[in-house]
């Protein structure tokens, strides 16, 4: 059975079409009108080995906030839908990723209980036209609609582009680990019997 989802979300602020294949090859087709986010989603797909297609249009003439946050929302919802009842998944995942002078870590639990711990101190700057404070908004939208507990930690580093890139790569690798099927797991990885 394919673990995939296709979601379309239309609001007065954004129009987003997204498809996700969890058991993919890391292929991506991304067009969000936010070039830096395109880059982050492309490497997210590649390092998580997810096949991901995103087409988004938003009120970027105002700023990128709604578009970035809403893509996080839709991506989280796609993971939730694709995982279904979560039978057989490992549930937990973690990754520590270096990017030159940066080291970032992510630990995740696909528990159904959304919670974001975001220990990433970034200066209030832009990478191109992209406000780096939107990285948190993206991940908050993601966890809220995926039902994931995500701990994102910057251990050290200076270059803001490298920091954000390491965070997205670590998140992808942790989610790849957590979504893996394990033949030894009967039902769900919980003593409650439900996630």
UniProtKB/Swiss-Prot annotation:
It is found in: Cytoplasm. GO terms for molecular function: imidazoleglycerol-phosphate dehydratase activity. InterPro entries: IGPD_sf (IPR038494), ImidazoleglycerolP_deHydtase (IPR000807), ImidazoleglycerP_deHydtase_CS (IPR020565), Ribosomal_Su5_D2-typ_SF (IPR020568). One of its GO terms (biological process) is L-histidine biosynthetic process. Its main location: cytoplasm. Pathway: Amino-acid biosynthesis; L-histidine biosynthesis; L-histidine from 5-phospho-alpha-D-ribose 1-diphosphate: step 6/9. The keyword Signal does not apply. It holds the Pfam family IGPD. Its EC number is 4.2.1.19. One of its GO terms (cellular component) is cytoplasm. Keywords: Amino-acid biosynthesis, Cytoplasm, Histidine biosynthesis, Lyase. It catalyses: D-erythro-1-(imidazol-4-yl)glycerol 3-phosphate = 3-(imidazol-4-yl)-2-oxopropyl phosphate + H2O. Belongs to the imidazoleglycerol-phosphate dehydratase family. This is Imidazoleglycerol-phosphate dehydratase. It comes from Geobacter sp. (strain M21).
